[in-house]
Each structure stands twice: as structure tokens, then as C-alpha cells.
Amino acid sequence: MSDTWLNKVNWSADGLVPVVTQDAISNKVLMVAWMNPEALRLTAQTGEAHYWSRSRKKLWHKGEESGHVQKVKEIRLDCDEDVLLLVVEQVGGVACHTGRHHCFFKKLEQDQWLVTEPVIKNPEEIYGQR
């Protein structure tokens, strides 16, 4: 596969694009992350999500430590060509490093952020003590 399709993406000045990751079954948004061209290429080639970690400044294969990989069903590019959507099968049901199904587990109620989603698996069981 030629890489010309990568040039259609409007990468930011720092060479990144935001990625919304959605569960293929529930349609819930699981997480938002970032990709550089190499992460997108690897995702397309392997069928599993790869992202760019801005804090660690390195490629990150989702599930490399936890086993909770994301099997990619679709890769979509938005109308402005500057945001990606990954539709995935979330292996193990846990997408968030907090041990929850998705990262959007805090909901604004009145003037407080309330935790609305349970922990599915204790992060220490997933990653060990850090």
C-alpha cells in the first residue's frame, strides 16, 4: 500500500492529529488520543490501534502492557481532514488506564464532576504497581 493516503490528513504543525476512538458495538466514545503518520500507518497495516504519546514522546500500541488491544474495524477522516475516528472492538472491555470501559466517566452535575462509571478491573491488576 502506498503512503499517499497519509498526505490527505491535515496534520497539525507538530505532526499530530486527534483521534476519537469509538466502540463498534455500543457506539460509545472510548477515548481521545493522538496519532502521528507512523502511528496511523501501523494502525492501518496491523489492524490494531497505535497512538502517539505526547507525554512519553513515543509510539504506543494500545494494549501493549494491559492486553486490552483495540481491533480496528474502520478508520474514518472527518470533513476537514484534521480529526480521525477509529471504530474498534475493545478487547477485554477496558479502554481507560483507570480500569474503566471508557475515559469519559466523569459527568458534570450542578457544579461537581461525578464519577458515573464503575472500575471494571483494578489498574494495579492490569499494570502492576507503578
Curated annotation (Swiss-Prot):
Its main subcellular localisation, reduced to a broad class, is cytoplasm
Establish whether keyword Zinc is in the entry: yes
Cofactor, how bound (note): Binds 1 Mg(2+) ion per subunit.
Q: Which cofactor does it need?
A: Mg(2+); Zn(2+)
Q: Which GO terms describe its molecular function?
A: magnesium ion binding; phosphoribosyl-AMP cyclohydrolase activity; zinc ion binding
Give the record's pathway. Amino-acid biosynthesis; L-histidine biosynthesis; L-histidine from 5-phospho-alpha-D-ribose 1-diphosphate: step 3/9
Q: What is this protein called?
A: Phosphoribosyl-AMP cyclohydrolase
Source organism (scientific name): Nitrosospira multiformis (strain ATCC 25196 / NCIMB 11849 / C 71)
